[in-house]
Amino acid sequence: MRHGKVHRKLNRTAEHRKAMFANMSASLIKHEQIVTTLPKAKELRPIVEKLVTLGKKGGLAKRRQAISEMRDIDQVKKLFDVLAPRYKDRHGGYTRIIKAGFRYGDNAPMAVIEFVDRDVEAKGQDSGPVQNEASEAA
């Protein structure tokens, strides 16, 4: 029987899963849109929804709770200062999942998970040293 089994294991240990979703939620908050496999996107959605709700509640304790969940202080700052005010009038449903075909190598179902009413300029912004050097040279 599968009583009480609500989450997918995704063929990872508990520590690996927790770290992966912390990184994915930080990436989603940073870029406001990421491409991943469909099962990972479906598991990431409730984690990010809860983080946005924490941001909307505000306060130091909620900020520390979000830091312990996400482990990225810069993205927690964006969550509380940018995303929380953006969704202050929306009661849940902050993200959407769009199916994006199948991956070439292993035919895995892919999906795009993004914030509703996202900032289009945030995608790809500050994506590491290569883009930073290109933007400084321009």
Swiss-Prot record:
**What one GO molecular function would you report for this record?**
structural constituent of ribosome
Keywords of this entry:
Ribonucleoprotein, Ribosomal protein
Query: Which InterPro entries does the protein's record reference?
Result: Ribosomal_bL17, Ribosomal_bL17_CS, Ribosomal_bL17_sf
Q: Which domain of life is it from?
A: Bacteria
Biological process (GO) annotations? translation
Q: Which GO terms describe its cellular component?
A: cytosolic large ribosomal subunit
The family line of this record is:
Belongs to the bacterial ribosomal protein bL17 family.
HAMAP family reported in the protein's UniProt record? Ribosomal_bL17 (MF_01368)
Assembly, per entry? Part of the 50S ribosomal subunit. Contacts protein L32.
Q: What is this protein called?
A: Large ribosomal subunit protein bL17
Species lineage: Bacteria, Pseudomonadati, Pseudomonadota, Alphaproteobacteria, Hyphomicrobiales
